[in-house]
Amino acid sequence: MLANSREELVEVFDALDADLDRLDEVSFEVLSTPERLRSLERLECLARRLPAAQHTLINQLDTQASEEELGGTLCCALANRLRITKPEAGRRSAEAKP
């Protein structure tokens, strides 16, 4: 599914936030050991999917945004906005490259 508008993108992020909030509020006490393992497996699969969207956004910023728009280099902008170290920002930027 491709988002066709800014509003649709906002809706997708809002829904993801809401679902993660719900996940934070549940108790896993009702699950059996196999169900807990399956739940961990599902969380791992979800966590591995997130970088794909991050890579797309980082690459778009790298190719389409000026340092003036970013307030500095891409690594500095990522570090500041994401509240991560500059080396971590550099690692993410390098990892995102096709």
From Swiss-Prot:
Name of protein: Putative uncharacterized protein Rv0095c
Pfam families for this protein: DUF222 (PF02720)
Family stated for the protein in its record: Belongs to the Rv1128c/1148c/1588c/1702c/1945/3466 family.
Natural source organism: Mycobacterium tuberculosis (strain ATCC 25618 / H37Rv)
